[in-house]
């Protein structure tokens, strides 16, 4: 079903001084609940509805009508719970240092665990009913059609499903899961004492996570080195702590892999979307085979920046000095203009979302950094968290996240709740397609070659970040999960060594392409996506499809837009 609940808790803080915020720059979570009291009232109702699921136990095979009745109940309770979870998670996202918001999120997690436990009998009972009878039920009761995919998934994964008692035990441990991600979130957001440095122009730069992403692009090379040394130096201080936390998550994954009788965690995680591990392995092999192309890009970048020895802190600055500010209103208009090829209704829906305050725009102290779209509140609308820095990367980011939002909006509009969700494997197509359309638009309106070079450089950097960098992350994940699956232990220092070796190989350190200081190998601890195991590879697999979709739409190939919108 929905795939965005965990994502909203997997980012970190931001504390860059933002432009003066206007009411329209803050999202309106009151669209979910007017206040916490209303949330509490709904929580009591959902809690009661969860208890009603027990009446279905032992009766799924009674008749097609009974099966539909029970699945309808489970679906309705899940839908209502997701709305509650989005409110709790995004309230915490506004200020992760606020104890009341953390408590609300924890209460949401308790209720979610209770729902999972209450429904734990469904899968083994469907298997006990048997494929033949389920197929007959689907023929007899047309209303079961919306559950066909879920039922087929249950039947497909039968070898990894326990009996009712076993599933209940596994479900009972759900409340204890995900703590490593929560530790990462609070430590990197609320507790880590991020440094402040003085730049060459005399200004001070607060290097929290959003500050790092902003100041790593500065033109002065000595300043960039200062930024990297200070930021990664702070993370290095927490290498032991982050190592224990991440190793805890790896062990948790391995335990569930064994319980579910999978050969390894990679296979288990991919099986959720019925993706064979060969796809993952092929991506990493293809990426490694094409590292010379990445190295050519780095050499070109070094030449354009005028540096004789490319360093890791030379990756992010723009290739030209054309950089200018893109205030949020201009960024939104550029995005709206760029997506016009997707249709008037698409643009209108996006504009409606902007005007209706679906988006939280600027960085604030204790606000989650990065960007995400929370789309699980089926009967409300998506919410977007952004940390807008008035640069072109920020414009590209809002185009990306609004791609997710529109995917969710139109999917929810066209389909009932049980079938409206979509796999991350295709989700990133909608987001990166918008980025491709934005690039095309910006190149068309660029005033001179320097401006065009800025956008082309950004596109190259996007390809590096979305394909090569995510594949590098995927290789690291495959390596460390496999080690723990084999029974090995891992410390923070060992994780840094493993990541550093991969980082240096991808960047051609041994060949002198990009020199990587050992300190920077602590970067693994900074990546929030690692707490969603085997997630990032899907960025790399999606970008090829999205580029083809975008080109076909721009070329107005017959049926191209219809095929894309159907997806």
Give the positions of each predicted feature:
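C-terminal, non-catalytic "cap/extension" segments appended to globular domains
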Residues: 19-21, 30-34, 122-130, 137, ...
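A well-structured
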Residues: 17-322, 332, 503
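Short pre-active-site segment immediately N-terminal to the catalytic Zn-binding motif
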Residues: 326, 379-399
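Long, K/E/R/D-enriched contiguous segments that form extended
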Residues: 300, 304-341, 407, 460-466, ...
